[in-house]
Structure formats: structure tokens, C-alpha cells
Amino acid sequence: MTSPSPRIQIISTDSAVRSPQRIQIVTDQQTGQKLQIVTAVDASGSSKQQFILTSPDGAGTGKVILASPETSSAKQLIFTTSDNLVPGRIQIVTDSASVERLLGKADVQRPQVVEYCVVCGDKASGRHYGAVSCEGCKGFFKRSVRKNLTYSCRSSQDCIINKHHRNRCQFCRLKKCLEMGMKMESVQSERKPFDVQREKPSNCAASTEKIYIRKDLRSPLIATPTFVADKDGSRQTGLLDPGMLVNIQQPLIREDGTVLLATDSKAETSQGALGTLANVVTSLANLSESLNNGDASEMQPEDQSASEITRAFDTLAKALNTTDSASPPSLADGIDASGGGSIHVISRDQSTPIIEVEGPLLSDTHVTFKLTMPSPMPEYLNVHYICESASRLLFLSMHWARSIPAFQALGQDCNTSLVRACWNELFTLGLAQCAQVMSLSTILAAIVNHLQNSIQEDKLSGDRIKQVMEHIWKLQEFCNSMAKLDIDGHEYAYLKAIVLFSPDHPGLTGTSQIEKFQEKAQMELQDYVQKTYSEDTYRLARILVRLPALRLMSSNITEELFFTGLIGNVSIDSIIPYILKMETAEYNGQITGASL
């Protein structure tokens, strides 16, 4: 008699013999393991046959299968516990599935149900994070959520995702994961390994507390933040916890509940690269963390970390090694400014050349200031995502300043000094202008909630909390006042120009020229307001009196609130020269090759 399973061949014995008739060594065709089969006749003399499977040397506990006659479906499975084959436990089963379960093997003759990954169509390994998926998509989704990675699509955000092309566009792959039902909160709630204790930067919070903001997908109203703290919260040394999770209500949410930010394809093409430098700094920070923790070997082939780091160093090298040919034009040459008035030197005193702008200081291209947020947006945002959004705003502001012909004419050294002196004011104006896009009120509410809990647990000093809370209050007041005045794009552009060309910062050279540009910006703002809002006599005065409030906000606190979670101990001042030296083509080149 031959067993129906192809894995083990069992040979029967003559039923007239009551003692073991045959001992045969067979090999499991799948595992290659050798098994000993002893064939015997049941002591009662019935036709039942007993097949004893033990190790080849006859030692150790074996499995005994007592097979009934072909007319019966009953089967007995006996586990022996001694050398004399006295059964230690007998379990009677009547269905093949139970036999398979007890034997620890599957019936290969029974057709197996094969499930396929709903994302890429590969063979699924089970249900992961709420959707049937393969190990590849499971790992990709987990890494994307755990590391809060942001991707961009080189096409129109509708790339084909299948088994063979799933690695070509990570943006569309993550988008499809969300569309097919994978839940980010399922990844966040997973238990972290106990033996992995990563050292955090000294100026970042070490707490494991999390902030959740409940969101009604059908309501555009700002949600109310609620605080959840882990039991083992550790000592906090900075303002924000890198593990803090924030759910930010976005004005545009698809009806099917998919949490994706609506993006303008043209804006993504022209401005999407502005987030590249944030990714560059993030890549360098991630590299440092990986090397410090010795976990570089854990990186998967699907991760783009290695290539991102390579591109990061290449980009920074290009910025540092910029040749003289890439420097701004000489003051003696007229700058052809498609984005503003022409620049001409009207005095050739080598010590203090005077530059005159023919035409407007700013053009319509400088009025456009559209921030593209990282997408897709995770349902629970953490500090890294907030810092990534803030860094895009900072880079957009610097890109805007660099495009002004009058700014270019001042030279690279003066450009760096000006931006270092006023980046906090430019950034704050950008926050006010993009407050709705960034859901700034919700972000600030979550931060306040987090800080309130920190002071209750004595993680931050009272004086430090007071400084930060005052800073947040000033920031919120400024943004609210600008929203109340309903400042338009032209007015924001001229206010930024007035702030940019401020001659009263310590250490500036050529202050007379800078002051001349500031006066021109003020005059053009006055002309615009009088022409556009002729009925509002005091509008210009109400706008200008808001500028002193910008000087009251600490750049150090702004840096720690919005950037420390991304760049660690790297200061904004040290990054500014690299940003100003980099060309727009380099930004776009980074984005074009960002997706693997």
C-alpha cells in the first residue's frame, strides 16, 4: 500500500504476520530527512495496519498512525513516549484537516488557496496592516511609515504598480498601498524592539509621548488635540519629541477617506525640488544615525537611502566647489532680469558703487509663492514631517530671494549676510502666508499640548516653557493679524523685500545700497496699496506696523521648533550658504532622479 502523500512512501506488510514484518528507511522528498517505517499487524488480528515513524536509529519519540480499513473514515493518531511503543496520548480524529494539523504537515493533494498581493499582484504572505499583501509591499509600507519617507512621482501620479514595476515609482506604490486599505496606524501601534535603544541628539526630546488629534474626514474644522503618554517616558532635553505623532486636518480630503494631499502638477514640477535640500539634510542625518547605531546592514534593496545619500554628497560638493563662472555677474555689467527691473551701476566709485534698478524691484513672478507640501501625508504626522514642511517653506523663501535681480547684484557675501540676518523674519512671513496650507493652527495647538504635559512631568524647566509659549503666542498673534488684514500676494512680496533689504543688521557692508533697495520696495508697496485699496486710507500704515513684531521672535526657538527634528545640531546659518550657491537646475535634477 502506498501512502496518498507523495512526501513519504509507506509499504505495507502481510496481514498474517503479527510481529513487525518490515523496517524500511525512506527519505522525505521535500526536506530530505530520513525516516524509519516499521510495518506491523494490529494485535487483534484485524486488517488494521500500524505504521510507526521514528528516527532511523530507532531512538527518540515517534509518531504512530493507526489507519482504519478503507471503508471507514476514522483515523487514530498515537504519540508514543517510550521505547516499547506504549502510547502516551491517543487522539481520535475523523477529518483530514485535523490529521494534517496534528502531523504538522499539509495534504499536498488538496488544492491550496493562493492569495495575491492587492498592491502589486505578487504571491501574498498574509494580511498585513489591513490588506492582503506580499512581503515586499509589507516591508515597503512599514519602512515608509516608520521612517516617514516622502516620495515624488516623475509622471502624473498614476504609474502602473505590479510585481515587475513596483520599485519604479515609490510615490505611486505608497499611494496604492493606502488606496487598497493598508493603515498607517497599524504600523505605528506595533511594538518596538526592547533591545534597540537608539541614542537621540542632545537637543531633541527623548520622550516617547505621542500627541494624537482626532480627525473627522467630513469636517473641515480643526480637530481637538488629545495627549497620550507612554508609561516609560524618559527624560526630555528638547522642545519636541521626535516620536510625537500629530494628525493634521487637511482642507482637501478625498471622499473615500484616503489621506492624500492634492497637489498641482505644474507646481510640483517647478517647486517640488525645493524640498530636495530637506531630503539631503535628512539623508545625511539618517546616515549618521545608521552608522552610530551600526544598523546599516538592515537597509533593504528597495530603500533609496543609499542613492539619496550619494546624491546628497554630490549636491553639496557641487555647491561647495562652485567656480567663479557660476558667481553673480559683475556690478559693471547690466543684469538682464526677466523677473524684475534691469540693474545698472550709476557710480563707479570702487569703494561704494551705487546701483540703480530701472523698472520695478519685483515682478509678477515674485508675487507667486506657492508651497507644495510633502505627499502623501500620513494620517498621524510626526515631528519629521512638520520639519520637512517647514524646510520646504524655508528653501522656497530663499529661492524667492535669490531670484530678485537687485539681490543678486549685491554679491554672494552680502547675500549670505542678509539672509542669515533675516531668515527668521522671512520664514515667519512665509508661515503667515501659507498658514492654511500648512494647517499651522493645528500644528501649534499640538505643540502647546505637548509642552503642557512636559511641564507637568518636569521634563522642561518652567522658564524654558515660558519662553517657548511666549514665542508661540507671538507667532500665532502675528499670523492672525495678517489674516485679519487679508494681506494679498503682492503685499506679502513687498513686505519680504523690505525685510530682506534691511540695512540695520550688525556686520553688513554696503548698507547705503541695501537701504536704497529697501526704500524702493517701500515706495512700490505704497503705490500698489494706494492703487488697489484706494478706499482704505490707513491700510499701508496697518501693514507696516506689523513688521516690528517679527524682530521679537527668537530665531533659536524657531529653529528648535521647526528644524531640530530634521537637521539635529546643524544650524540654519550653516546651511544658508549652500542653499544660496545651488542652482535651480541642481534642485530639479535631484527630484528627477529621486524615485527608483
UniProtKB/Swiss-Prot annotation:
Q: Which residues form the NR LBD domain?
A: 341-583
Q: What are the record keywords, sorted?
A: Acetylation, Activator, Differentiation, DNA-binding, Isopeptide bond, Metal-binding, Nucleus, Phosphoprotein, Receptor, Repressor, Spermatogenesis, Transcription, Transcription regulation, Ubl conjugation, Zinc, Zinc-finger
Per UniProt, subcellular location reads as:
Nucleus
Instruction: List, in alphabetical order, the Gene Ontology terms for molecular function in this entry.
Output: DNA-binding transcription activator activity, RNA polymerase II-specific; DNA-binding transcription factor activity; nuclear receptor activity; RNA polymerase II cis-regulatory region sequence-specific DNA binding; RNA polymerase II transcription regulatory region sequence-specific DNA binding; sequence-specific DNA binding; sequence-specific double-stranded DNA binding; zinc ion binding
Q: Where is the signal peptide?
A: none
Residues annotated as transmembrane: none
Q: In which tissues is it expressed?
A: Expressed in hepatocytes. Also expressed in granule cells of the hippocampus and the cerebellum.
Q: Please describe the post-translational modifications of this protein.
A: Phosphorylation on Ser-19 and Ser-68 is an important regulator of NR2C2-mediated transcriptional activity. Phosphorylation on these residues recruits the corepressor, NRIP1, leading to transcripional repression, whereas the non-phosphorylated form preferentially recruits the coactivator, PCAF.
User: One Pfam match, by short name?
Assistant: Hormone_recep
Q: Where is this cross-link: Glycyl lysine isopeptide (Lys-Gly) (interchain with G-Cter in SUMO2)?
A: 192
Residues carrying Phosphoserine: 19, 46, 55, 68, 98, 219
Q: Record's Gene Ontology CC terms? A: nucleus
**Which parts of this chain does the entry mark as a DNA-binding region?**
114-189
**Where in this protein does the record say N6-acetyllysine is found?**
231
Q: Where are the zinc fingers (NR C4-type)?
A: 117-137, 153-177
Family matches, as InterPro entries: NHR-like_dom_sf (IPR035500), NR2C1/2-like_DBD (IPR048245), NR2C1/2-like_LBD (IPR048246), Nucl_hrmn_rcpt_lig-bd (IPR000536), Nuclear_hormone_rcpt_NR2 (IPR050274), Nuclear_hrmn_rcpt (IPR001723), Znf_hrmn_rcpt (IPR001628), Znf_NHR/GATA (IPR013088)
Q: Can you cite a GO biological process for this protein? A: cerebellum development
Q: Tell me, how does this one assemble?
A: Homodimer; can bind DNA as homodimer. Heterodimer; binds DNA as a heterodimer with NR2C1 required for chromatin remodeling and for binding to promoter regions such as globin DR1 repeats. Interacts with NR2C2AP; the interaction represses selective NR2C2-mediated transcriptional activity. Interacts with PCAF; the interaction preferentially occurs on the non-phosphorylated form and induces NR2C2-mediated transactivation activity and does not require the ligand-binding domain. Interacts (MAPK-mediated phosphorylated form) with NRIP1; the interaction promotes repression of NR2C2-mediated activity.
Described by its record, this protein's role is as follows: Orphan nuclear receptor that can act as a repressor or activator of transcription. An important repressor of nuclear receptor signaling pathways such as retinoic acid receptor, retinoid X, vitamin D3 receptor, thyroid hormone receptor and estrogen receptor pathways. May regulate gene expression during the late phase of spermatogenesis. Activates transcriptional activity of LHCG and is antagonist of PPARA-mediated transactivation.
Identify its protein family.
Answer: Belongs to the nuclear hormone receptor family. NR2 subfamily.
Output this protein's name. Nuclear receptor subfamily 2 group C member 2
Source species taxonomy? Eukaryota, Metazoa, Chordata, Craniata, Vertebrata
